[in-house]
A protein has these predicted regions:
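The feature marks the mature, well-folded catalytic cores of soluble enzymes
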Residues: 1-227
């Protein structure tokens, strides 16, 4: 017996319940395999192009900046221009994601690129989102070897690539996308982060402060590439 089975067994005993009957088990399995959909707001509905435009509008409203790419090979030059515009050094730490292996990062002069998780000493981090949520302009980040969670929180500037084909309508759709990402293994990531705009807080005297608990800048590279 696994530790999970033992724990669930103790809970059943405390509740005075025995094993699930066939009907109860079928109800539980149906809820897991085909979860019921909640009411879908208007902002989470629309054709793919409508959702993309809504994602851009909502992300911008949340103080993120958005730059559209036609090909991932454009990323180094666009990032270099963005860093120059923000008066930031041309150095970043990127996730070891397969999508980020394609560009020639040395094509831009004076561009220093390191890879992997950050220890907090990097000013700029580059990640790839699992998907984007049009309803609120939110990025969904699933932790893993190709997506270190530290890049989401420690660098002062967070740059995130998201494919246009990975823009979904609402939060329920993002969980569907996560299940697809998990595949047959059904193994959940250690963490799933929903990021809407830069980090902010107004705890002190109701004065809004960007970068209070994470990056003060969020720059999104929207890749016009079907997922």
């Amino acid at each position: 017996m696994s530790s999970r089975d033992a724990m669930l067994g103790r809970i059943r005993t405390a509740l005075g319940r025995g094993p699930l009957g066939p009907d109860e088990a079928a109800t539980v399995n149906a809820g897991l395999t085909e979860p019921a959909r909640n009411l879908v707001p208007d902002r989470a509905q629309g054709k793919p192009q409508d959702l993309i435009e809504r994602f851009i509008a909502m992300a911008t409203e949340a103080s993120a900046s958005v730059d559209r790419l036609s090909d991932i090979s454009e990323a180094p030059a666009r990032i270099s221009a963005y860093l120059a515009g923000q008066n930031l050094p041309k150095a970043l730490r990127r996730a070891e994601h397969s999508l980020l292996e394609t560009p020639d990062w040395q094509a831009c002069s004076l561009f220093s690129v390191s890879t992997g998780a950050t220890d907090g000493n990097d000013l700029v981090g580059l990640s790839v989102a699992l998907c984007g949520v049009a309803e609120t302009g939110t990025l969904v980040m699933a932790s893993g070897p190709q997506s270190p969670i530290t890049l989401n929180f420690l660098p002062d500037t967070h740059i995130v690539v998201v494919r246009a084909g990975d823009i979904v309508g609402g939060y329920e759709d993002s969980w569907d996308r996560l299940r697809q990402h998990m595949g047959a293994s059904r193994v959940m990531p250690r963490a799933v982060n929903f990021i809407t705009g830069p980090s902010r807080s107004a705890d002190i005297e109701q004065t809004l402060l960007l970068g209070a608990h994470g990056p003060r800048r969020l720059h999104i590279l929207l890749l016009d590439d079907p997922a």
